[in-house]
Amino acid sequence: MRSAPYSSSGAGAADGARSRNTGLSCDRFYASGRSAVCIASHPGISQKTKVNVLDRELNTRKTVVVGGIPNRARVSPSGRMVAWTLFVSGDSYASSSFSTRSGILDTRTGYLVKNVETLQLYLEGRRYHAPDVNYWGITFADDDNRFYATVATKGKTYLVEGDITTWKARTLRRNVECPSLSPDGTRIAFKKRVREGAKNPWRLHVLDLGTMRETPVAETRSVDDQAAWLDDSTLAYALPGRAKGTSDIWTVPVDASAAGPRLLLSDASSPSMVVAGG
């Protein structure tokens, strides 16, 4: 049994990383356990996305059609739970032309939540209601019940911990976007807004869930991605490539005192770690 990084596309491998042509066309992809998810824009007048749930051989098991533009995708460590985030338009409360919709699918039972905004949200300990609540960037714990995500309201972002069984979520910390839970379940990698405006607004950080201490990683470029853990000490993420409209996958140790960023794969996106030959 061996593990290898996987991406939704790739033309140039660096330092031994490999890619293969699967025949899939995905705007976002993620694989874990015995499942993968491929979310792709669906041609048509209205904004639609196909969420294709795949088995380990990347055969389609189930397809869900939802409204919006692909943004994020995640699968729980076991492969049972699948989540996605889409950009949507038309919300009257939105300060810009877009807001988000996040959904969760239980592949074992078929239970589908197309919009997690029905969660009972507790903001800083108090039950919270507001029409502008948006969730994105879901990441699952290994019990297929607990999850983390970003929630935004009144111009602020928060890390939330959610419970699927009770359908409740509570905020843990401000200024956390696109969380990614470490394989050992003790840390969250996330992008933190470090400056206002559209130019280089984010920097990757790692949050210790036990101490709530956050540490920036050695990557100083602005990363607009939901980083993936390749192991307990390495993150992978996409950055814009040299050609317009392309991206490359980079890695960085979570220990800021270790080596700096390294190019893993050119012309690729949506990194994830899969186990081959198991």
Describe the residue ranges of each PLM region.
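Sequence signature of WD/YWTD-type beta-propeller architectures
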Residues: 1-278
